[in-house]
Amino acid sequence: MPVQAVCPYCGNRIITVTTFVPGALTWLLCTTLFLFGYVLGCCFLAFCIRSLMDVKHSCPVCQRELFYYHRL
């Protein structure tokens, strides 16, 4: 969820841009599903579920990363 902030790099008042990136929880679930014998690539479904991914917040003006939220 984007947040309103003042960018410490460019000084502008911004609403952050959020990007979902695979993190430890995503890889852990993928590995667990693979080890328990899920076939036909079902283990890769973890990469399609945003609530399992980490979130990167960045400034829309200077494109710098402001915060990284780790799910695990």
Curated annotation (Swiss-Prot):
Its main location: membrane. The keyword Magnesium does not apply. GO terms for molecular function: zinc ion binding. GO terms for cellular component: cytoplasmic side of late endosome membrane; cytoplasmic side of lysosomal membrane; nucleus. Zn(2+) binds at C7, C10, C59, C62. It is a peripheral membrane protein. Keywords: Membrane, Metal-binding, Zinc. It holds the Pfam family zf-LITAF-like. Residues 1-71 form the LITAF domain. It is found in: Membrane. The keyword Zinc applies. Residues 22-45 are annotated as: Membrane-binding amphipathic helix. GO terms for biological process: regulation of cytokine production. The LITAF domain is stabilized by a bound zinc ion. The LITAF domain contains an amphipathic helix that mediates interaction with lipid membranes. Belongs to the CDIP1/LITAF family. PANTHER family: LIPOPOLYSACCHARIDE-INDUCED TUMOR NECROSIS FACTOR-ALPHA FACTOR, LITAF DOMAIN-CONTAINING PROTEIN. This is LITAF domain-containing protein. It comes from Homo sapiens (Human). The gene is LITAFD.
